[in-house]
Amino acid sequence: MNDAIEFVRDIRHCAEPWTWNLLQEDGEITYSPDRDARTGWIRYKCKTAKAFTEVLKTLEYCRGCFCGDNGYTRRFGLRGCINTKEDSEALTVTAYYGYVRL
């Protein structure tokens, strides 16, 4: 698993949006944002290695990207925080985003 993470971190382009959408439609990617905006954890369950790779590629691409949000700038991506877990059903990627005061 660590090899996969290191490989994906070397990829500098975003996953094609249509690929992500197809994976979601097929149920290969499901995600559950933490409803508590103070913590900002999002868990992505990936049922295939392809889905896992697409999630990591996209998160890596989005790291450092900013968008305005209620007087704050929301920073998406890893911020050095990524956990992976493998169980009988899926690979789970837990990513973190935070808020930076404008």
What is each PLM-predicted segment?
Residues 30-96:
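Acidic, low-complexity, intrinsically disordered interaction modules
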Residues 1-33:
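N-terminal leader/targeting segments
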Residues 1-3, 99-102:
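Short intrinsically disordered terminal tails
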Residues 9-10, 95-101:
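Mixed-charge, Lys/Arg-enriched low-complexity segments
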